[in-house]
């Protein structure tokens, strides 16, 4: 998958290459990240997600996060290169703060938070009858996979990331699957990602073990597009972005040759619209007074389906789950969409961490969520 960045980006990179791979974002330097995360559409091909009349998010009582070590919010945001945070409780904005030169109109990339978007569109496609059942074989919708390791994998197992197909998600290895999945020779009429995934070997029986695989969410996105006959951007606009009332157009990155959108990443939206997506989920998936998702979808998608080997945590249908009932979409470089039904709470963070992920950054982000919870709980 080849994309053509601006000359300014090439200048920032200090390189002479005439184009960049989409996964080059994993290896950008800090100035590149902070410049490009707010303008991915300037560097890569994308589809527009049209918005409707904005769903109001009125101001609520101001909230000051209470960090256990006394850290201030400004210090936290500066130290971790945070572009924006928003806290919405009971449908009201209790905290909204920006950094890195971002503002209310800034569209910031979400990376793997987009996985939760794609999962939600599966719920819509089930309600519409475009997807018959989660127990359908993936090959019903993507027959090009029939000769490989995905031939016996179900839609549900893709959503759970329990296909058993071998995968390497190492963000610092330029030869890992996540770095190479948009590379290789194209076959006429076949998305490049499908060609790559069709050649992967099996490691475990389907359904036996969870392994995080961005490429599989890309397959889910292709499956939704095949089932509905619509691009992910168009379907998201039709089912959620317009009827629920997002405040601005969003963007979904795509392959500039075959037009395939990346279901596992690539959504860019404003801070407030990420919060609105969380509120849509809290509201039970209702838009314009009508249910958008299959009955019971939200409860099923946001409960633990897979053991990920972390106490108190699990994985649902492209949502990370917690034993307290909260769940979240997480993206590399610091992105977060946290939903807490018990507290009627949505927390969003957009950032440009200096690394894709590491324990120290992840712990700091988790402490930010706890700091918000302390303030909400009055403790």
PLM region descriptions:
Residues 104-105, 170-172, 178-258, 265:
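Catalytic-site signature segments of enzymes, centered on catalytic residues
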Residues 216-223, 263-286, 335-352:
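Active-site-proximal alpha-helical segments within enzyme catalytic domains
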């Amino acid at each position: 998958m080849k994309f053509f960045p601006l000359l300014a980006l090439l200048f920032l990179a200090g390189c002479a290459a005439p184009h960049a791979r989409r996964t080059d974002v994993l290896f950008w330097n800090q100035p590149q990240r902070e410049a490009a995360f707010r303008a991915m559409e300037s560097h890569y091909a994308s589809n527009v997600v049209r918005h409707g009349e904005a769903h109001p998010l009125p101001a609520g009582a101001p909230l000051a996060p209470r960090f256990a070590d006394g850290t201030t919010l400004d210090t936290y945001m500066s130290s971790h290169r945070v572009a924006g945070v928003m806290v919405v409780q009971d449908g009201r904005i209790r905290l909204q703060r920006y950094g890195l030169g971002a503002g209310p109109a800034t569209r910031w990339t979400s990376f793997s938070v987009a996985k939760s978007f794609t999962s939600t569109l599966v719920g819509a496609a089930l309600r519409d009858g475009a997807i018959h059942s989660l127990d359908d074989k993936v090959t019903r919708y993507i027959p090009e996979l029939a000769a490989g390791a995905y031939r016996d994998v179900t839609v549900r197992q893709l959503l759970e990331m329990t296909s058993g197909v071998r995968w390497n998600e190492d963000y610092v290895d330029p030869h890992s699957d996540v770095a190479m999945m948009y590379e290789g020779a194209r076959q006429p009429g076949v998305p490049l990602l499908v060609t790559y995934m069709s050649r992967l070997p099996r490691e475990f029986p389907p359904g036996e073990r969870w392994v995080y695989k961005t490429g599989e969410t890309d397959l889910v996105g292709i499956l939704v597009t095949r089932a509905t006959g619509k691009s992910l951007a168009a379907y998201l606009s039709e089912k959620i972005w317009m009827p629920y009332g997002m405040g601005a157009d969003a963007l979904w990155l795509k392959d500039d040759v075959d037009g395939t959108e990346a279901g596992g990443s690539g959504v860019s939206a404003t801070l407030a619209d990420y919060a609105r997506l969380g509120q849509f989920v809290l509201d039970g998936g209702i838009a314009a007074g009508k249910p958008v998702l299959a009955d019971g979808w939200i409860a099923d998608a946001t409960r633990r389906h897979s053991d990920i080997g972390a106490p108190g945590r699990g994985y649902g249908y492209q949502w990370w789950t917690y034993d307290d009932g909260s769940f979240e979409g997480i993206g590399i470089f610091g992105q977060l969409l946290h939903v807490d039904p018990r507290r009627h709470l949505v927390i969003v963070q957009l950032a440009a961490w200096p690394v894709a992920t590491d324990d120290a950054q992840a712990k700091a982000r988790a402490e930010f969520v706890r700091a918000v919870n302390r303030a909400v709980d009055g403790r």
